[in-house]
């Protein structure tokens, strides 16, 4: 039996986007070919806080998705202040303790911001101190706290102060309104792997090249397990 047959699937904790849910994120990933998805053990969870506001405040989320909808934390309009971020981190660690262990994280949008910050916070000893080290992250339409457009939550001022050596796969959409945030995030990781696609702020469909990029990244991760 060769090494490829012995390689196990990476177990991945998945963080959905702002005002959606674990179920919705799971459905969004169905656009990926089955041969890509079956390479991983993906575990989808709901964020700890119900989406705030009425239909008008929920906006597009209320139009596109069926409730219940959730969010990981809250911020003011210019992202200079955050609420419930510490509680969010505690919730994540509890999830990883109860239903783990996990090898890595995957996040979309708000979930990608969270996923991107956690390896640095864990290395600093301010988060995820009771669970195994995060071995990799996959970030779809992400960005970084402390970047050009977002301040840092009080718990995470140093999340990106040192280069993050954790292997990372970054999905960058040509039509994504947050593309500059995703590009800025690349500088915080050592040897980031980039998957470019022509779509917007979405979990993208994968062409042959995109599927190949994902498979190669996953196989690289399997060598670390």
Report residues per predicted region.
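Acidic catalytic loop of the alpha/beta-hydrolase fold
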Residues: 145-147, 172-180, 201-202
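Gly/Ala-rich beta-loop-alpha elbow adjacent to hydrolase catalytic centers
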Residues: 103-115
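Short glycine-enriched nucleophile-adjacent loop
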Residues: 112-127
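Catalytic active-site module of serine/aspartate enzymes centered on a nucleophile-bearing elbow/loop
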Residues: 207-225
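Short beta-strand/loop motif that positions the catalytic acidic residue
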Residues: 163-164, 168-172
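The conserved beta1-alpha1 loop
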Residues: 13-17, 141, 172-173
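Conserved loop-alpha-helix segment in the C-terminal half of the alpha/beta-hydrolase fold
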Residues: 174-192
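Serine-hydrolase catalytic machinery in alpha/beta-hydrolase-like enzymes
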Residues: 2-102
């Amino acid at each position: 039996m060769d090494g490829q047959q012995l390689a196990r699937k990476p177990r991945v904790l998945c963080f959905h986007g702002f005002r959606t849910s674990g179920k919705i994120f799971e459905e969004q990933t169905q656009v990926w070919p089955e041969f890509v998805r079956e390479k991983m053990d993906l575990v989808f969870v709901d964020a700890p806080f119900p989406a705030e506001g009425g239909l008008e405040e929920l906006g597009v989320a209320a139009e596109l998705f069926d409730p219940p909808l959730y969010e990981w934390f809250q911020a003011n309009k210019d992202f200079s202040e955050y609420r419930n971020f510490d509680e969010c981190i505690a919730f994540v660690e509890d999830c990883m303790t109860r239903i783990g262990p996990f090898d890595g994280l995957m996040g979309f949008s708000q979930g990608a911001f969270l996923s991107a910050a956690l390896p640095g916070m864990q290395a600093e000893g301010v988060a995820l101190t009771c669970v195994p080290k995060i071995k990799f992250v996959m970030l779809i339409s992400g960005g970084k706290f402390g970047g050009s457009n977002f301040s840092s939550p009080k718990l995470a001022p140093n999340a990106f102060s040192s280069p993050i050596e954790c292997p990372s796969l970054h999905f960058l959409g040509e039509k994504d309104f947050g593309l500059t945030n995703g590009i800025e995030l690349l500088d915080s990781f050592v040897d980031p792997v980039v998957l470019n696609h022509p779509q917007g702020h979405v979990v993208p469909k994968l062409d042959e090249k995109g599927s190949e990029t994902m498979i190669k990244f996953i196989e690289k991760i399997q060598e670390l397990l």
